[in-house]
C-alpha cells in the first residue's frame, strides 16, 4: 500500500535534505514546490508582503498541480513525499484526510529544529551567490513565519 509522506517544518529546518533521503529509501516520488517554482519563474520572492502576491499565487498553483500528480501516483501504488512545509494543523489534517480518502497510509516527518539553527543555515544559504536552488529569506520573514508555524503535537505525529 502506498504512503503519503508529509514533510513538516520551516525553511532551513532540513525538510528537503531529509525528503531526498526518503525518496531513495522508499523509492518515492518527491515533490518540492520551491524547485519547480525557481525553474519556472526564477527567484521572484522579495521578503515583502506587498511585492510577493504574485509569487504566492504561483506557489499555490504549483502545490495544487503537485497534489494532482501525487494523487494519481498514490492511486498507482507509488509512495509520494510532499515537501510543502505544512505549517498549520489544518493543512496537515487536510492531507491526512486526503490520504485516507484514497485508501493510502499517511506519515508526517517533522523537522524539529531551533530557530537559531535555522537562521544559521539560512544565513549560509543566503550568502551563497551561486545558489539558484533556494529563495533568499530575510530574518524578519523567518521570525514572522516562526510565529505562524504550529508545531505538530505528539498525537498528530503518531496518528495514522
Model-derived regions: residue spans:
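ATP-dependent NMP and nucleoside kinases share a basic, alpha-helical "lid"
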Residues: 74, 86-127, 144
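Amphipathic alpha-helical transducer elements in NTP-driven molecular machines
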Residues: 56-63, 67, 112, 139-146
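Phosphate-binding beta-loop-alpha motif at adenosine-nucleotide cofactor sites
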Residues: 78-87, 155-160
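Conserved GTP-binding G-domain of TRAFAC-class P-loop NTPases and closely related GTPase folds
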Residues: 2-4, 13, 17, 21, ...
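Hydrophobic anchor at the beta1->P-loop junction of P-loop NTPases
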Residues: 7
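Phosphate-binding P-loop
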Residues: 1-2, 73
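Conserved substrate/cofactor phosphate-moiety recognition/catalytic segment
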Residues: 17-78
Amino acid at each position: 500500500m502506498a504512503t503519503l509522506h508529509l514533510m513538516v517544518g520551516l525553511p532551513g529546518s532540513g525538510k528537503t535534505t531529509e525528503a531526498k533521503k526518503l525518496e531513495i529509501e522508499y523509492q518515492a516520488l518527491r515533490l518540492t514546490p520551491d524547485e519547480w517554482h525557481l525553474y519556472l519563474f526564477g527567484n521572484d520572492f522579495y521578503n515583502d508582503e506587498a511585492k510577493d502576491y504574485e509569487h504566492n499565487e504561483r506557489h499555490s498553483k504549483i502545490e495544487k498541480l503537485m497534489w494532482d500528480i501525487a494523487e494519481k501516483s498514490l492511486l498507482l501504488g507509488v509512495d509520494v513525499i510532499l515537501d510543502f512545509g505544512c505549517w498549520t494543523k489544518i493543512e496537515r489534517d487536510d492531507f491526512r484526510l486526503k490520504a485516507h480518502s484514497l485508501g493510502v497510509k499517511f506519515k508526517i516527518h517533522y523537522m524539529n529544529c531551533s530557530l537559531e539553527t535555522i537562521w544559521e543555515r539560512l544565513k549560509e544559504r543566503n550568502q551563497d551567490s551561486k545558489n539558484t536552488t533556494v529563495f533568499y529569506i530575510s530574518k524578519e520573514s523567518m521570525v514572522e513565519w516562526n510565529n505562524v508555524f504550529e508545531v505538530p503535537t505528539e498525537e498528530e505525529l503518531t496518528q495514522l
